C-alpha cells in the first residue's frame, strides 16, 4: 500500500472505470512512502536490545584466553581461540588436529536441555520423536529426530533416560526454547489430559565435552567415577562425584573420537572447566571452538540442523531412515512423510564430497546440469550444504544434497 506503487495502480483502475483518479479514491499511505528509520532496517544489529545476550558459566575464561566469539541464537560461543600471530583458519586447524591426536575441550553448555517427566512421558516422547523413546533403558542414551507436522526435520539430539518416568532431551543450541514451546503447545492444546511435565533446564547446567584419544586418561586421573569401556559403554551415562563435583557423565560423541560430556550445576561450571585444563595439561588438553566442532562432525559425516536442513528436508533425504521407528503407529510428521512427492526418487540425497586438492568449495555451490527450466534458469542437480578445509585429510571436504545421492 505504498504511495509510489499505488498511484500506478489507481491510474490503471481509473482508466478501466473511465474516471479521474480523485474520483476513484486513494488508500492510506504507508511505508515505504513515509520515512523508515535506519534502526528498523538494522533490526537487532543496532546494539544491545531487550533480549539479553546469553553467556555460559565459562565465558570469563573464554574472554581471558582470547576467544573469538560467534552468535548462536542469543548465545555467544567461542568460534576459535587464535594465538598471537595466528589467523582464525590456522587456529581452527590447530584445534582440530590437537583434538584428533591428543585432547580437546569444548564448552557445550549452550546445548538445549529439557526435562520431560511424568507417567505419560514415554508415550509423549514417542509422539515427538521419529524413533522409540519409551523403551529406552534407564542409564542409556539414544539419538533422536524431531519433525514438524509436515514431516520435515526440525531438530535432533541425544535423549537420556534418568529414571522410570524422567527423560532428559538434548536439543540444538538455538532450538531449546523453540522445542520446549513445541512440547508445551502439544501438551496444552492436544494432549491436555496426559500426565507429562516439561522444564527447560538449559541454563541450570554447565556442560563440557572431553574429546580425543586421551579423554579417558584425563577423567581417570581426576577420579571419582569409573569411566572404563566396560563400566560406561558408548551411549550410556553415569552420575557421581568427578573431582569432588557432582556430575552426570554422558558417553556420547559428535566427532567420532572417544568423547565424554560432563554436566554439572551451572555454579560449578567454571571450576570444572579450569580443573579439566589444569589436570589435562599433561595430556595435551586444548580448548576448541565451534568451527573445529563443525569440521570434525563433517569429517565423521554427522548432519547439523540448519546446515543440512532448511525446512524442506526429511530424514530419508539424509540417509536417516534407520532413525524412524517401524513399530510405532504414529508420530508427529508420519503422515506428512507419506505424501507422494516426498517419495519421489528424484529428491536430492545427502553425500559426502572431497576435493582433489586443498581447495574448499564455496558454501551453497550448485551442481549445474545441462538445459534450463521454464523460467530460463539453468537446471541444477544438487547443492553444497556444508564445506570446510579438513586438516585431518589435508583437503577440502563438503556435504551436499544431490540427485541420486549415494547411488
What residues fall within each predicted segment?
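Glycine-rich, Trp-frequent "lid" loop and neighboring beta-strands that shape
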Residues: 158-159
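Conserved, structured C-terminal
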Residues: 2-6, 39-71, 77-79, 83, ...
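Acidic, proline/glycine-enriched N-terminal capping motif
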Residues: 12-147, 152-154
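C-terminal, active-site-flanking charged/polar segments
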Residues: 1-21, 407
